[in-house]
Amino acid sequence: MKKIDRSSKVRTGFHQAKWDEPVIFELSKHGERGILVNKADPKVAEAVEGVSALPEFLKRKEAPALPEISQPRVLRHYARLAQETLGADVNIEIGQGTCTVKYSPKVNDQLANLPQMREMHPLQDESTCQGIMEIMYNTGKYMCEISGMDRFSFQPSGGSQGILGMASLVYAYYKSRGEEKQRNEIITTIYSHPSDAAAPHVKGFKIIYLHPDENGYPDYEAFKAAVNEHTAAFFVANPEDTGVYNKNVLKFTKLVHEAGGLCAYDQANANGLLGVTRARDAGFDMCFFNLHKTFSTPHGCGGPACGAVGCTKELEKFLPAPLISFDGEKYYYDYETTNNPAAIGKIREFNGVAPVVLKAYAWIR
């Protein structure tokens, strides 16, 4: 079969539609509706006080500024906007920042939108959530196999929050050893994601930036000079945002470990490495994956995110609570594993974005 060269047709030769499309608020017509909401059942209305139970300061003084618009008009509006965009459905090679974006199977969106998933509530009793808890537990097992780590948390809801989770693990580890004041420096490279510096800075660490050598790799001699008794951890994306993979990364992680530090792997650029190498094999103590990049769930404005954080057995007790465990008969929210004064507690409410984990599970399977 003849290979089709789409580069000139899609990227440089792309001709987008041009619509003089108003913003959706300008399409609003008073009294127009896209859906008619049923009135509450009398028994429900009687049992629930509704607005009258709200304190006065929470009650609106006027109606919200929402467009009044029919379904066909909404459909045409967003279809026209989509025609003006070179999106992932038109060309999978589209770049979003430094991201390598996978195809997000549409069937997975349908799966996540099933009533059994969509209508669940995070405060349900765990006995009624065994299905999704099993999926989250097993997805964590898959992540461990892919990365070489021992335990994962899906609580962080994005890449930067995943890096913040790793920075929190680093701080918790040294706090448990009484070394949090001494170990106050994080080394990262200038071509790693900016969050690899920003998130540890939020946790109070001093950031040491590493520049590349003449070959584009992180400068190892400069790295050796930077590592000392104050080094808490090495945070790095590999490959970096230049697309260059540091084949000598094991030398870097070994040096940090010899100095008593930890190594954290930003795997936002992991698409090209799956099945080739693993974070643990490269000497890292923790890592995170963007499920919304590497495991096919929609990225950016296409949907919610998850920055899954994994770590070694030694660091497991510091992970966000609760974890999900299995006792041989049922899955349960595990607060005991992380029940220690140094544990980082919560990164966000509840246990992460469950539909994102479900989509990643389906893609892996």
Where do the model's predicted regions map?
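N-terminal glycine-rich, Lys/His-bearing helix-loop that initiates the first secondary-structure elements
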Residues: 1-119
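Gly-rich Lys/Arg/Thr-decorated short loops/hinges at beta-loop-alpha junctions or inter-strand turns
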Residues: 58-59, 114-127, 145-147, 201-208, ...
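Short acidic-aromatic active-site loops that bind/stabilize oxyanions
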Residues: 67-71, 125-137, 156, 160, ...
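Short, hydrophobic/aliphatic alpha-helical segments
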Residues: 74-90, 139-149, 289, 332-341
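Conserved phosphate/anionic-ligand binding catalytic regions in large, soluble enzymes, centered on
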Residues: 87-109, 154-166, 295-310, 350-362
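Short loop-beta-helix segment that forms the pyridoxal 5′-phosphate
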Residues: 128, 141-168
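Conserved PLP-enzyme active-site core in the AAT-like
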Residues: 131-134, 161-332
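Structural motif of enzymes handling amino- and sulfur-group chemistry
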Residues: 332-365
